[in-house]
Amino acid sequence: VTPEAITNVNTATVAGETTKKALEQYPAGGIVYFAKNLENREQTVALLENTQSYAKIPLFLGVDEEGGTVSRVGSNPDMGVPSVGDMRSLGKQQDPAAAYAAGQDIGGSLHALGFNLDFAPVADVAQGADSVIGSRSFGSDPELCASLAGVIVKSLRAEGIVSCLKHFPGYGSATVDDHNGTSIVEKTLSELEGCDLVPFQSIIASEGSVPFVMVSHLSYPNVTGSDTPADLSASIVTDILRDKLDYQNVIITDSHSMA
């Protein structure tokens, strides 16, 4: 949940008695923060420390910090953290050591602030000039995406940060941003298996403890037989992710505040 969802404030930048009472009433498992919640380093540390102290069971405190265009923390110069470039640039280097260093920078910065969950890395395979995922992806080679996303998982873990692969079962061929409306991917399951699913399958198999997988809002009618969004589809979540890929850890949806 967002802090606003349980406290009913417009923008949560402090955690005090209102947050304490909210967590007593709504014992959430985790809270996700956005740029609007994070004003500067000192404020963010206090916000997260206080929030965590009010929870009877330790919370996941998460943020979208991919590097590049999706950097809720790194995009704010007042946070005093190193800026990490986009994943496409890392993909072009084809250097696992560079990817590991980027993950260390991100993970170390988040851990120092009090976060313990990063909704990253992006495991999507960019396909075509119109791909919405763009520079957020490591590139168009499924094996490269699998390798470098797996490296980020390891480096985040080394810094005490839980990772989340996204956006299952693959956002790379989408040409409409699902923040702006319904997006349909016409691929069949065999086509997904030959490209989009490769990074997810590889990382889940080799990194059995990858803690989270985020499922997208995209529709895959040639897989599910309907326009049901992936994160509401038993065919996607249960049949493919749980059963076929044997993923047994936490599955989370993309934000339901999107269009």
Task: Identify the function of each model-found stretch.
Residues 6-24, 98-109, 194-200:
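Short, acidic/polar
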Residues 7-11, 15, 39-55, 59, ...:
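Second-shell residues forming the walls of enzyme active-site clefts
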Residues 21-35, 221-222:
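A short aromatic-anchored loop/beta-hairpin motif
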Residues 29, 116, 211:
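Short acidic/polar active-site loop segments enriched in Thr and Asp
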Residues 32, 118-119, 164, 214:
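Conserved beta-strand positions in the central sheet of alpha/beta enzyme cores
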Residues 38-60, 67, 94-114:
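Active-site-adjacent structural elements in enzyme catalytic domains
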Residues 60, 65-70, 123-129:
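Acidic helix-start/capping segments at beta-turn-to-alpha-helix junctions
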Residues 85-115, 120-153, 157:
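A substrate-binding/cap region within the structured catalytic cores of diverse enzymes
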